[in-house]
């Protein structure tokens, strides 16, 4: 059912297929915890292409590949000539002749689409400018682990509503039957074509989509999600974003409005919640702020599941690689 398929964006898989993958990841997590080997990709070779730097995505793909018995090979921006001295199409054909599967984390969705088309191998999107599908598997796995189900839960995303994480949450939630509220300034709301796509899937799953500017949309949330205010490559926009998003910070006063006191707080990381990074020390010096998108109090509260969420990147990446490359017996669903 999954064999040989790429995972470039969330709509590549149906609702039932995504739910199957989430349950498969939960199973693989149990195997990992019980030290039971699961080498479904024994002696496979995996190319890990990273145009953008990464902590969780690189660590997750590397660890997942090794656990599955595969050999991961990291290819950073200084290692290959992707689109510079060699076209992406030519690179795809070369890598496809040497590797069994390819991960890509980069700047353009069109690049990962070309890799998948011309390599002839399963390609997995580790993040592009538009979508972050492997993050979504981890996010909704984490949500299911905490609530036992997904249908009819409400997730409120607060912050930069037009970045890849917001796009992916909006569409994936709509596919899976999760109500999604995006709370952001009008200038940072999801593109209309993304909203239209999400509403199409929400009609099928009977979920609700809400795009708004006020934080009152948090009251009925079961999940509160935020992300950095300035994405990689947008550093020149820092002052403008802080001005736009300062009132959208997730802090104790904001979360006290939430009716469900057992809500969970999520963040795909890294997070600027304290002064323990060089970036935040500069922010403190230039803008006199100790925290940005979330306060340290909320980030480290009992409601926060950010580190479970990060761990689940590895389990879900493992699951999608095994399902698409492992020649496993998976009944049709």
From Swiss-Prot:
Keyword annotations from UniProtKB, A to Z: Amino-acid biosynthesis, Arginine biosynthesis, Cytoplasm, Transferase
Listed SUPFAM superfamilies: Aspartate/ornithine carbamoyltransferase
Enzyme class: transferase
Pathway: Amino-acid biosynthesis; L-arginine biosynthesis; L-arginine from L-ornithine and carbamoyl phosphate: step 1/3
InterPro entries, A to Z: Asp/Orn_carbamoyltranf_P-bd, Asp/Orn_carbamoylTrfase, Asp/Orn_carbamoylTrfase_sf, Asp_carbamoyltransf_Asp/Orn-bd, Orn/put_carbamltrans, OTCase_ArgI
GO BP of this protein: arginine biosynthetic process via ornithine; citrulline biosynthetic process; L-arginine biosynthetic process
A GO MF label: amino acid binding
Binding annotation for carbamoyl phosphate: 54-57, 81, 105, 132-135, 268-269, 313
One Gene Ontology CC term in the entry: cytoplasm
E.C. code: 2.1.3.3
Catalytic activity, as annotated: carbamoyl phosphate + L-ornithine = L-citrulline + phosphate + H(+)
Gene3D superfamilies, A to Z: Aspartate/ornithine carbamoyltransferase
Compartment(s) of residence: Cytoplasm
Keyword Cell membrane appears in the UniProt entry: no
Residues at which L-ornithine binds: 164, 227, 231-232
PROSITE patterns, A to Z: CARBAMOYLTRANSFERASE (PS00097)
Record NCBIfam families: orni_carb_tr
Family from the record: Belongs to the aspartate/ornithine carbamoyltransferase superfamily. OTCase family.
Function: Reversibly catalyzes the transfer of the carbamoyl group from carbamoyl phosphate (CP) to the N(epsilon) atom of ornithine (ORN) to produce L-citrulline.
Name assigned to this protein: Ornithine carbamoyltransferase
Organism of origin: Lactococcus lactis subsp. lactis (strain IL1403) (Streptococcus lactis)
Gene field: argF
